[in-house]
Amino acid sequence: MIDPIHQFNVEKIFTIGHIGNQEIAFTNSSAYMLLAVAIISLLMIGGSAGRQMVPGRLQSLAELSYEFVANTIRSTAGVEGLKFFPLVFSLFMFIMVSNMVGIIPYTFTIASHIIVTAALAFLVFFTVLIYGFKKNGLGFFKIFVPSGVPGFILPLVVFIEVFSFFLRPISHSVRLFANMLAGHIALKVFASFIPLLAGLGIAGYFGAVLPLGMVVALTALELLVAFLQAYVFAILTCIYLNDALHAGH
């Protein structure tokens, strides 16, 4: 059986340079990150160039993406949250496009590496932290003190709130990483059964129908998961930003 983990290997394409003894390389992961950015750029530039009253497919897709993210921000962080639209939109589109590209056979799934998802999660975490203190000062600490909590359990609640706050980037990154990793491993495992069973002759052809059907179903599911994981990452970002925007509310 083909190794289902091999598809996640980061492979060097060429060396960029060195910092001390550390080699800086351009990898397949770097290439697919650039590809995702290029696809998003082409979509948004192509969709906004020569706009029509009756939009074409590209313009409709660009406008739909824009409005979807804008409405998500308004519903979770309020109108004031729209100042973070560039951040949330970039995260949503980058994760969704890279996830969908990764479903194509023989490509690379960027979000299958915890270092990538952790970088995105910590970007959100430090944005919330920095903006929260900039806007609210020491009042930002109010997010750790829920209103209406009886005084005798307040220290415990504050401890839990602080602990959960610093766990945010971990849960934020692991959720995306684990879902993409597990889904692609399942796809690879079922796909590897198809040629193995088909090689057994007529009986094998009939036996290969089941894994083939599973691959088709899992691929459809992965397309849905690719969107849902991007949406979950974006909406959690909005919820966290809401703490910075409206501390103590």
Curated annotation (Swiss-Prot):
Transmembrane segments: 30-50, 84-104, 113-133, 143-163, 196-216, 221-241
Pfam families for the chain: ATP-synt_A (PF00119)
Chief site of localization: membrane
CDD domains: ATP-synt_Fo_a_6
Keywords: ATP synthesis, Cell inner membrane, Cell membrane, CF(0), Hydrogen ion transport, Ion transport, Membrane, Transmembrane, Transmembrane helix, Transport
Record's bilayer topology term: Multi-pass membrane protein
InterPro entries: ATP_synth_F0_asu (IPR000568), ATP_synth_F0_asu_AS (IPR023011), ATP_synth_F0_asu_bact/mt (IPR045083), F0_ATP_A_sf (IPR035908)
Location(s) in or outside the cell: Cell inner membrane
The keyword Nucleus is assigned to this record: no
GO molecular function, one term: proton-transporting ATP synthase activity, rotational mechanism
One Gene Ontology term, aspect cellular component: plasma membrane
Function (record text): Key component of the proton channel; it plays a direct role in the translocation of protons across the membrane.
Subunit structure comment from the entry: F-type ATPases have 2 components, CF(1) - the catalytic core - and CF(0) - the membrane proton channel. CF(1) has five subunits: alpha(3), beta(3), gamma(1), delta(1), epsilon(1). CF(0) has four main subunits: a, b, b' and c.
Assigned protein family: Belongs to the ATPase A chain family.
Name of the protein in question: ATP synthase subunit a
Naturally occurring in which organism (per UniProt): Rhodopseudomonas palustris (strain BisA53)
Lineage of producing organism: Bacteria, Pseudomonadati, Pseudomonadota, Alphaproteobacteria, Hyphomicrobiales
